[in-house]
Amino acid sequence: MGFPRILSKNHKIYTKLGEFCLSGDSFWIVCHTCQEELQTQDAFWKHIQDEHNFLHGVAKQEHNRSSSSSYCLADVESASAVTSNTTSVQTAGNVTTVAVPVALYKYTEDEQRDVAAAVELHEAQHQQQQQQQQHQQQQQQQQHQQQQQHQHHQHQQQQQHLHQQQQQQQQQQRDAAKELAELHAVAAAAAAAGGGGGDSSAHSSSIGGGIDIKVELTPEMQVAAAAAAAASSNTTIYHLSQVVPVSAPAPPPPPPTAAAASSFLSGGAGSATAATIVGVSTTATTTAAAAAAVTTVPQQSQLGSGNNAGAVMQQLGLPLIAVAQELAPKDSNSTTASASSAVSSDDGERWYVCDYGTCGIKFKYKSRMELHRVVHSKERRFNCDMCSASFKQSCNLSTHRKKKHSLRGIKSDLLPQRF
């Protein structure tokens, strides 16, 4: 809501006669001429008509609306004419009172010049802005044209470069074809010269002298060729060693079984260690068979093959014992509860305490403590069948399957992978 303005009876707005003053819910009008406060607009109009001789509507009847360069200029002219008549009447001795309408506002020549100067300045600024915009547009067009020319020039250079490369490739192909033709011509001439009275060796030597072919091998091909040559030489030697006749070759010694391998282990070995020993014994069996096959070949020409088999068994038994001792569970890394881990509390209840280092966690059941001891070992029995991850406990595997693979299964599915 805008500030209220003073309206006349013919709906004109006067802003130079009075001013509205607001205070809470009440308002009053202050006269600009005498600074008197009036409570209503009717009282304000009556005041300016009575006190300041303002005749409302006189200016509208006396001057034309089209020629209004300055506001109420006709009122001022009529007031000056009436004033001259009043002075003439006063000279005659009769004093008369003439109501002169008060001019609201009049533009002076200075103000008119200022307005004209402001208008000219505004027009000049507008023209200057238009010129600047035109200049900027021209600069942008020039830059765009320069960019297009530069791109066209680069495109032409690229085409020329490609054309030159194609010409060079074609020239190289022509040179290679020319060289091949010359080589064929030389070979044909040499064949014709040697065919009249020479043998095949002279013919081949003349062809070899005319054409020099170089075959270069990469380092990988050289290594592969050397390996193939070594393999062929080893195979030849192997077959030569088997040429020696053998009347009755001795059978290979029986491989050590899982029971023999487990005999080297201590009595406290767990099921996981036994499973590992079975795998190791199988590997040792394969190694023993290969070693027996290798050692029996050069010794077939000698006597006493049974003694050699016994020596092989003795040699293979020592590494197997060492492997079994390494795989035997240690005291600090055992997953089995020892007898000293059972502790009785004050109330007579029996507890199983983990004696690994400074752990000291108590369990009510021995099986729970054995499951807990897996945490301290390096063995990861639970393997994920979706990836290569392995875990010490089944709970960790189930959590991994839920989070990584979004799989949910029962506990019977999460079995330790022993083999």
UniProtKB/Swiss-Prot annotation:
Ranges where the record places region Disordered: 121-179
Coiled coil feature spans: none
UniProt-annotated location(s): Nucleus
GO cellular component: nucleus
Principal subcellular localization: nucleus
Chain intervals annotated as zinc finger (C2H2-type): 29-52, 352-376, 382-405
Compositional bias per record (Low complexity), positions renumbered to this chain: 126-149, 156-173
Name this polypeptide is given: AT-rich binding protein
GO molecular function: DNA binding; zinc ion binding
Entry keywords, A to Z: DNA-binding, Metal-binding, Nucleus, Repeat, Transcription, Transcription regulation, Zinc, Zinc-finger
Annotated organism of origin: Drosophila grimshawi
